[in-house]
Amino acid sequence: MAVRLDVKTANALVSDDVIQTLEMFHYTTDPDLRVIENFTGMHGKKIGGAMMDLRGLRQRAKQKFEIGQEMFFTKPLLEQASSEPVAKYRAQRFVDAGFSYVVDACCGCGSDAITLAQAGIKVDAYDINEITTVFATKNAEVCGVTDNLSIHCADSTEVELPEGAIMLDPARRKGSKRIINPEMWSPSPEAIGDLIKSRPAACLKLSPATDIELLLELFPAPDEIEVISYRGEAKEMVFWYGKLASGVERRATILPSGDSCSGDKNSQAPTADEIGDFIFDPNPALVRAGLVGKMAGELDLKNIDPHIGYLTGNKQLSSSFLSCLKVLAIDSLDPRKIRVIMRDHQVGSIQIRKRGISESPVALTKRFLPKSYGDKHFTFIATRVKDSHIGILAELIE
């Protein structure tokens, strides 16, 4: 069980003695029980337990940050922090717009503020939580940006903030739980509206999993909406305001390539009479940004169903925004029929893709490929077309 942190323990974690101990055991192959015995023996039970928690978080942080092994987090802070490539992409927007100073109104572990500072921007960063600011301050030191970044423990909605462009990433977690209702985020939508008011520019970072229409109801209307995906997963929805907006209504961006698609929302692609020779699975950034129809129009593709994101056509196409799959067989989502298809194509393993189907990929695999019929690997698409559930065996075209 994770140690409940207090300010005293947080300050102990960033002390030289504890840092040296953590470094000492960084490369150890000792089992966790032996490591925590050493930690508690050297620093006491509470601090030792907190060190063990931090050690585990740092292992995960390496997936997000180049020097994550040296940084400081709580679990909620790490989970909300942007991956470094995403934060760098966002920071470049501020640079390109000509901003040399930014206010970060809810800085968390400091990752966004640090990335802005690394881009040469002066930053004043605020957070209401003292433990958070202890860690953010130390992270700024670890990353070597203290000349450009100042951390303040204060409620950004209660103090008079400096003028200039503002960065906002409202807290969407309480303890280990994600807060689904945006009205419960901190700062609240109303408070964020007040913080954005009269500023030359603002960047509001939001969850891509939240309904976009709900966000538009609650937050000030943005000048641009961008959805950013990283390595195939939608990571952020960003509302851009003022001089940070690029002049388009919607944008989908794929990282690390940096490829971008922009346009007006929700232009609807026509629906196909039947599924063609190829299925195209749009990148989630394209789906969340409402730009699937625009992409379909440009490439002469059609929806397989107006409420399902898959597109179809008869020509093989290459696009960073679309996975191209060659259709091998189609039938109703009946285990008996699908297993015949699996046997006929000598399928040994499948990757599941699904839309409009509630079953998990694991459950679908067990139901439709209960045993190996050969040594071939294909993609199996479970989806809905009108009122029917169908299964499509397909080959991913790399």
Predicted regions and their residues:
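SAM-dependent transferase fold signal centered on methyltransferase-like domains
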Residues: 1-398
